[in-house]
Each structure stands twice: as structure tokens, then as C-alpha cells.
Swiss-Prot record:
Subunit annotation: Homodimers. Interacts with host IKBKB; this interaction inhibits host NF-kappa-B activation.
InterPro entries: Poxvirus_B14/B22/C16 (IPR011212), Poxvirus_Bcl-2-like (IPR022819), Poxvirus_sf (IPR043018)
One GO BP annotation of this record: symbiont-mediated suppression of host NF-kappaB cascade
Gene source species: Monkeypox virus
Membrane-traversing stretches: none
Record keywords: Early protein, Host-virus interaction, Inhibition of host NF-kappa-B by virus
Keyword Cell wall biogenesis/degradation attached: no
Entry similarity comment: Belongs to the orthopoxvirus OPG200 family.
Protein name: Protein OPG200
Gene3D superfamilies membership: dsDNA poxvirus
Name of the gene this protein is made from: OPG200
């Protein structure tokens, strides 16, 4: 019997970056980040300064959503619409604060990590990405750009 080891390390474009150069890169960077979060730690590239900043958004998720780990476990991640409605119970305004925006990103990153696969994302971890994309708009990307840099 032989052991089967994965040698693939997921390495998205912005993972090793220190900052973004354009607001237009924010959505792509966040998409890559949530996707990256779906991989097991040993199967993804080490985070650079930019991703370290994004990882800190989990702290905002804990302050906005309180018991974020329980929320991540109990939300119906197989249903994007229901998840967005649950988040809107915590963050009802269309005009979100910078802390609320980063909390949404942090919550979805928690979910992607919790529900992620060993060497590839799962349907639930991908739905965490879709929830984030559903919750954020261009104004949110513009606001969060300044915190990311």
C-alpha cells in the first residue's frame, strides 16, 4: 500500500501581494481569497501582507456576528439566498460601514475554511463565495479597497 500525497498548492494571483493597485482589482482579489480559504492549510500558498489583512477581517466577523463559529456551522450554506437573508438580519442597511463590509468578508472566509475541502473547494465553501459576492456591491469594494491597502 502506498500513501497518496497531494503536491498541488493553490497559489492565486494576489496571495503574495502586499497591496492592490486599483479598486477594479478588489472583487477579483476577494474572490481568490475566499477560494484560497477553501483549501486545507497545507494545500495553499502562504499568505502575503494583503491576505494577512484579509485574514484580520475574521476579527470583525467575530465582533459583528458574535458567535461566528456557531453561525458558520448552523447557516444553510447550501442555500445562498437564505444565507444572505440571515446576514441581512445582522447588517440590514444597504449602506454598510467598513467594519460591516469586512465582517461579511471575514464570515465568508470562516465558512470557506470550515466547509472547505482537502485539495479543492466544496459546494458549501463555494457558496460562501457566492454569498459574499451577493452581499457586496461596487461601493463596498471601493470602501474596502482603502482598508486593504
Amino acid at each position: 500500500m502506498t500513501a497518496n500525497f497531494s503536491t498541488h498548492v493553490f497559489s492565486p494571483q494576489h496571495c503574495g501581494c502586499d497591496r492592490l493597485t486599483s479598486i477594479d482589482d478588489v472583487r477579483q482579489c476577494l474572490t481568490e481569497y475566499i477560494y484560497w480559504s477553501s483549501y486545507a492549510y497545507r494545500n495553499r500558498q502562504c499568505a502575503g501582507q494583503l491576505y494577512d489583512t484579509l485574514l484580520s477581517f475574521k476579527d470583525d466577523a467575530e465582533s459583528v456576528f458574535i458567535d461566528v463559529r456557531e453561525l458558520v456551522k448552523n447557516m444553510p450554506w447550501d442555500n445562498v439566498k437564505d444565507c444572505t437573508e440571515i446576514i441581512r438580519c445582522y447588517i440590514p442597511d444597504e449602506q454598510k460601514t467598513i467594519r460591516e463590509i469586512s465582517a461579511i468578508i471575514g464570515l465568508c472566509a470562516y465558512a470557506a475554511t470550515y466547509w472547505g475541502g482537502e485539495d479543492h473547494p466544496t459546494s458549501n465553501s463555494l457558496n460562501a463565495l457566492f454569498v459574499m459576492l451577493e452581499m457586496l456591491n461596487y461601493m463596498d469594494y471601493t470602501i474596502i479597497f482603502w482598508r486593504m491597502n
